[in-house]
Amino acid sequence: KVLSSEQRSRYDKAKKSDEPVMIVTPEEALENEKKKAKGTKTWVFQAENVRDFGFASSRKFIWDAQGVTFGNRTVMAMSYYPKEGNPLWEKYSTRVVAHTLKTYSHYTFPYPYPVAISVHANSIGMEYPMICFNGGRPESDGTYTARTKYGMISVIIHEVGHNYFPMIVNSDERQWTWMDE
């Protein structure tokens, strides 16, 4: 069993929520960080119509999510981040993912995948279908500058946007960089 029944219940609640819901709380992530896993957990990933893939795993991850409705479909906008990403990530990441999906879908075509995930990375931005790794971290005391905040928001918008170009459209980002960056 990968998620506890309580976490599964939160996930189901997040599907219907227009605000992020904690799936793995900061307290649960802290407990996970303190102890080693007993046994194994198996996650099975399957994706259609993707040209690349990426995934992230850490017992330190806090996980929040919210549903984004496109007609009769719900796409899950989600974020995974360690405690070092807060308060910035909890406040902004998933909301920015959801907003980006709505905006790109309005101006191009509906987002076809079931999830869009933003993963905290210390200082990079990199995209794969349905998942992107984004920088932006507050200082160790939890404070952050406007530059850090808007830099994080900008890189999330940019990397989630790469789901459309080049991932879904399947443009060649090396040949047509003007479409990519």
Please provide the spans of the model-predicted regions.
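Active-site metal-coordination segments of metallo-dependent hydrolases
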Residues: S93-T94, E173-E181
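Short, intrinsically disordered, charge-balanced linker/junction segments flanking boundaries
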Residues: K15, H158, T177-E181
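Hydrophobic helix-coil surface modules that form long, contiguous segments used
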Residues: K1-I157
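Glycine-rich, histidine-containing beta strand-loop boundary motifs that form or position
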Residues: V115, M167, D180-E181
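Catalytic Zn2+-binding segment of zinc metalloproteases
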Residues: V160-W176
